UniProtKB/Swiss-Prot annotation:
Organism listed in the record: Californiconus californicus (California cone)
Disulfide bonds: C43-C57, C50-C61, C56-C65
Compartments in which it is found: Secreted
Keywords of the record: Disulfide bond, Knottin, Neurotoxin, Secreted, Signal, Toxin
GO CC annotation: extracellular region
Tissue expression pattern: Expressed by the venom duct.
Major localization class: secreted
Signal peptide region: 1-24
Record remark: domains: The presence of a 'disulfide through disulfide knot' structurally defines this protein as a knottin. The cysteine framework is VI/VII (C-C-CC-C-C).
InterPro entries, alphabetized: Conotoxin (IPR004214)
UniProt protein name: Conotoxin Cl6.9
Length: 67
């Protein structure tokens, strides 16, 4: 009985993660502009202030776009 509970507890988070990634994949298919990690539309260039690397055209960010 304990083994069954342990297995269920171990598999449940994996199943939840799988559902989340499936939803994300479907969302990416619906919106093709999100597929490419190097989107050039609305991206910031070198020296621009950034909070995440995805904001920069080349995706390197350390408070400012590095490339």
């Amino acid at each position: 009985m304990k083994l069954t509970c342990v297995l269920i507890a171990a598999v449940l988070p994996l199943a939840v993660c799988q559902f989340d990634s499936t939803d994300a994949s479907a969302y990416m298919r619906k919106n093709p502009s999100l597929r490419s990690p190097k989107r050039t539309r609305d991206c910031k260039t070198k020296g621009s202030v950034c909070f995440a690397s995805s904001e920069c055209c080349i995706q390197d960010c350390w408070f400012v776009c590095l490339y």
